[in-house]
């Protein structure tokens, strides 16, 4: 079982289409737990507030207070992430996208455990090459596998907040599906 834990900063349609060329079968499970607009707004506001607070250290804030002039040095990464959260809030408010928690899992089976492990390594390598962070589950393997079953919404829940456009870009729309 390979689980995607980290996501790239940008997405495009057919983002994970490279998996189709690996030459073996796998089961792709996408579980998206959508948030209503109020809950998504609350979560995004919390993210924005946390990132905005990280722009300046406590020492910088104290120095600004004592000297009564703003410091030119800010954490630009935190500033950019606060701006991203603000842009996400604006997209949510305009109704362009929705937000939710996404869990992507790829299950591989083979009668030979060594072949299954090699297939898992190939899948992990292909996913990581696209800017994701994928892990071959070991300790959490049973929970991850249970989370791939329909109706099991509580096993292997991941917490990254993604919007619906990213979800559409990660959907296996280019794959052949026999059933």
Question: What do the PLM-derived regions correspond to, one by one?
Answer:
Residues 1-175:
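Extended, folded cores of ATP/NTP-driven motor/assembly subunits in large transport
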